[in-house]
Amino acid sequence: MIQIIPAIDLMDGRCVRLTKGDYGQKKVYDGVPADLARQYADAGVQRIHLVDLDGAKAGEPRNLRVLEAIASAVSCQLEWGGGIAHSEALQAVFDAGATHAIAGSVAALKPELFEQWLQRYGARMILGADVRGGRIAVRGWLEEAPLSIEDLVRRFLPLGLKESIVTDISRDGMLEGPSTELYVRLQSAFPTLSFTVSGGISSMEDIRSLDKAGLQKVIVGKAIYEERITLKDIALWLQNA
């Protein structure tokens, strides 16, 4: 069964959600991030998706204290993205408690550096590919690179890449359903790579459809905050996995 990965997006140490990656369309949610992470872990999730939105914009991690607090609160895997622009930042993220690191802008703009990270950290590195109109968006989705997700995968797959999170920016935060056909096409083209669906999840029915399509992982964010998907829903799904 498809693995559900709840998301916690961070700005100024708080839980937020953007719409289509627009920093001007921000909604702040109540609650302490570490407490929310603990609720997810209690529901039985194996991994939590953490995004440092301040870091993505600044090019440096900005919410590492929150990561430390979450890592102290839960024992599940933590994947972290945002602001990982150089090796010192990557090491700081791992030191703060992340089990996996997501590199998007570096993979697109400094591929030689991402290759070094793959060689050093192996499966702990995740390729983050944020797609808008078929092109890769970088630096907090504020710019675009003249590359496709296929270009990136073909480059890094021979070097040991195991996972890629692909976000369809046009669906992100919209609660309109995922771009299932995109992920099915990618999974078919690169069967040895584990693709994570990100963007648009609005209901458990979306998740069931992705599962039937043979996809392996899905990130759920706004649908949980807006109570379209409950922690009970997630717990029941995981119990049946």
Provide a role label for each language-model segment.
Residues 8, 52, 105-106, 129-131, ...:
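Short secondary-structure boundary segments
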Residues 74-100, 181-220:
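Catalytic cores of alpha/beta
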Residues 29-41, 85-91, 144-155, 207:
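Short, acidic/polar
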Residues 3-4, 55-71, 85-91, 105-126, ...:
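Active-site-adjacent beta->alpha loops and helix N-cap segments on the catalytic face
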Residues 3-7, 47, 75-79, 99-102, ...:
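Structural preference for beta-strand elements that scaffold enzyme active sites
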Residues 15-61:
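N-terminal beta-alpha supersecondary unit
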Residues 13, 19-24, 91, 98-172:
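Conserved anion-binding
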Residues 41-44, 94-95, 157, 211:
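Non-catalytic positions within long, well-ordered alpha-helices that form the structural scaffold/packing
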